[in-house]
Amino acid sequence: MAMNPPITPGEILLEEYLQPMGISQNAMARAVGVSPRAINEIVLGKRAITPAMSIRFGAFFSQSPEFWHGIQVECDFRALAKDRKRLTAKIRPATELAESGQQTAA
């Protein structure tokens, strides 16, 4: 059975905040001082919510910026989950190097 793709930060922004509050993407963009394209690309999942954007979103929605940053980080980790084995295949744990007494040049 195919799994649905994970919900993106942009979907949360649109479906949980903008639509219920009756706020357009353009109005939000003007209010937070970014281009409408930036907000639209976040909504479409084509752009990430950066730490700077998290600060703007937090101020706009009267929330902590960490909330928006956390949503983005969680999404980023979910996207990398399928590549985890490939990314870590050749990495030796630090404890293994320490136990073997190997040192690297500074």
Where are these regions (language model features)?
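A short, Lys/Arg-rich alpha-helix, primarily the initiator
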Residues: 1-23, 70
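A generic structural signal for secondary-structure junctions
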Residues: 17-18, 62, 73, 82
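The alpha-helix within a helix-turn-helix
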Residues: 18, 29, 58
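Residue-level detection of the helix-turn-helix DNA-binding "recognition helix"
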Residues: 33, 44, 73
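Short alpha-helical DNA-recognition segment
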Residues: 23-41
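Short, basic-rich loop-to-helix N-cap that marks the start of a DNA-contacting helix
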Residues: 46-59
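Short, charged recognition helix plus adjacent turn
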Residues: 67-106
